[in-house]
């Protein structure tokens, strides 16, 4: 039985080994730090299909000025303001960038792939695995909706939590501010129904495997 058979059924985190839990918490903290820094220190506009973060520079200034002047819809921004291809991100490129800067293996995949790839391919090619229930989600997980993905910063209460994402929606305060944090949102219905929860392999700990192993053992007995 391979690692996929163990990890696809994550259970409630137990106490686990202290070192394992510490490693998890440090990695979660790094992911939050990276995403927060991108939001606070770089001028990133939401650009559909955009894959490059913003920053201080002529092209970024021209992108921002163009967006303010023309006010194109999110999916028309790169077409209306060509300089924005150098200074914008969409939601899936944002989560890829955060994982990369946090030191995680993170090939790009679209939200369509996140929703439709089978667990085996997700694990083999992207080191991601589905988490079956929202009550098992935790900081660092990807919450995938139809056409959108967000990074979970923390659960608050019930089905609510804090998320950070690249967005061209109503939460955006203006050009250059496409990365937004939203607090205490309904995670089950943030952008329509929650379709899938994905967790990077390195965010699993040994305690997550125990319920899966026990369940398999009971079936074999």
Locate predicted features.
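Hydrophobic membrane-insertion alpha-helices, especially the h-region
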Residues: 1-5
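N-terminal capping segments
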Residues: 6-108, 146, 213-221
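Low-complexity, Gly/Ser/Thr/Pro-rich intrinsically disordered linker/tail segments
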Residues: 178-221
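Solvent-exposed, flexible loop/coil residues
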Residues: 50, 119, 183
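...with weaker cross-activation on analogous glycine-rich loops/strands in unrelated enzymes
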Residues: 30, 104-180
């Amino acid at each position: 039985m391979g690692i996929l058979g163990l990890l696809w059924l994550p259970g409630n985190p137990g106490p686990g080994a202290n070192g394992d839990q510490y490693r998890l918490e440090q990695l979660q903290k790094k992911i939050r730090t990276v995403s927060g820094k991108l939001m606070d220190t770089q001028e990133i506009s939401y650009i559909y299909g955009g894959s490059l973060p913003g920053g201080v520079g002529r092209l970024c200034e021209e992108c921002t000025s163009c967006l303010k002047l023309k006010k194109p819809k999110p999916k028309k921004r790169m077409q209306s303001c060509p300089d924005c291809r150098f200074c914008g991100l969409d939601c899936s490129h944002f989560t890829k960038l955060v994982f990369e800067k946090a030191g995680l293996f993170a090939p790009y995949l679209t939200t369509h792939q996140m929703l439709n790839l089978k667990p085996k391919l997700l694990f083999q090619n992207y080191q991601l695995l589905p988490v079956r229930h929202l009550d098992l989600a935790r900081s660092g997980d990807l919450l995938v909706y139809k056409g959108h993905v967000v990074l979970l910063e923390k659960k608050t209460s019930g089905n609510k939590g804090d998320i950070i994402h690249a967005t061209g929606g109503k939460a955006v305060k203006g050009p250059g501010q496409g990365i937004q944090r939203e607090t205490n949102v309904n995670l089950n219905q943030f952008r329509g129904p929650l379709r899938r929860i994905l967790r990077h392999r390195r965010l699993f700990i040994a305690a997550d495997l125990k319920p899966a192993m026990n369940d398999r053992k009971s079936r074999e007995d």
